[in-house]
Amino acid sequence: MLVLLAGIFVVHIATVIMLFVSTIANVWLVSNTVDASVGLWKNCTNISCSDSLSYASEDALKTVQAFMILSIIFCVIALLVFVFQLFTMEKGNRFFLSGATTLVCWLCILVGVSIYTSHYANRDGTQYHHGYSYILGWICFCFSFIIGVLYLVLRKK
């Protein structure tokens, strides 16, 4: 049981780190023709990065930014709640609060990455492919779901 809890803790920390990288890095879309990439915050070329995004005024991008930030906040809160429950909870109880908070993080990732996918990542005729930040977002989606379900199922022994 201790090994399982330690493994979940390590995966949870990795998820927090990957969420930070996914949200901060500017590699959600990468151009196939020129050396350029676009993120949630900046547009980067091989020379420099600029804060001016051609679609920055769109509400969809602001929604994606908000939900990705919320997912980081809920993931960190869930990690802190798990550590707190690990040391204060009585034996035999389940990690309901940690699991619920992690599943809220999972929903925030789902909404954020899905909106980005529907508005920006699937345009026909474009010369772009998905960058590592976008892929990390979906990996964090999977990890946070697995962690959340495991928190709900596990009991403290």
From Swiss-Prot:
- Keywords noted in UniProt: Glycoprotein, Membrane, Transmembrane, Transmembrane helix
Q: Where in the cell is it found?
A: Membrane
* Positions annotated with a glycan in the UniProt record: 43, 46
Q: Name where it mostly resides.
A: membrane
Annotated transmembrane regions: 1-21, 67-87, 95-115, 134-154
Q: Give any Gene Ontology cellular component.
A: plasma membrane
* GO-annotated biological processes: apoptotic process; bleb assembly; epidermis development
Membrane topology label: Multi-pass membrane protein
Do you know which Pfam families this protein is assigned to? PMP22_Claudin (PF00822)
Keyword ATP-binding assigned to the entry: answer is no
Family in the record? Belongs to the PMP-22/EMP/MP20 family.
Name assigned to this protein: Epithelial membrane protein 1
**Naturally occurring in which organism (per UniProt):** Homo sapiens (Human)
Q: Which gene encodes it?
A: EMP1
